[in-house]
Amino acid sequence: MSASFDRYVSFQHCDWEGRSERVMQRLQRHVEAAENPFWAYFAQKRAELRDKQGLDDLRILHNYLPTLRELLEDNGDLETLEMLEDLEANLM
């Protein structure tokens, strides 16, 4: 089998990359605020998973979904939480 497999073929017209990036941009504010040690860990793991394993932001968000949801709720960041839940419901 020489053709590569695109696991996101069904998301072709859903702008999953743009939507994931917008969530990551909003999460960056939490990373920079450094109010919880998880955020530094998350930023480090994101870089590692992207660089070493080639994972995209949608997959990384999926990997940390329960923790992200809890922290966003605790921080009252309901807009980012809503964006994350939309990704989960429609693309994960």
From Swiss-Prot:
Keywords: Nitrogen fixation. InterPro entries: CowN (IPR024899). GO terms for biological process: nitrogen fixation. The keyword DNA damage does not apply. Belongs to the CowN family. Is required to sustain N(2)-dependent growth in the presence of low levels of carbon monoxide (CO). Probably acts by protecting the N(2) fixation ability of the nitrogenase complex, which is inactivated in the presence of CO. This is N(2)-fixation sustaining protein CowN. It comes from Rhodopseudomonas palustris (strain TIE-1). The gene is cowN.
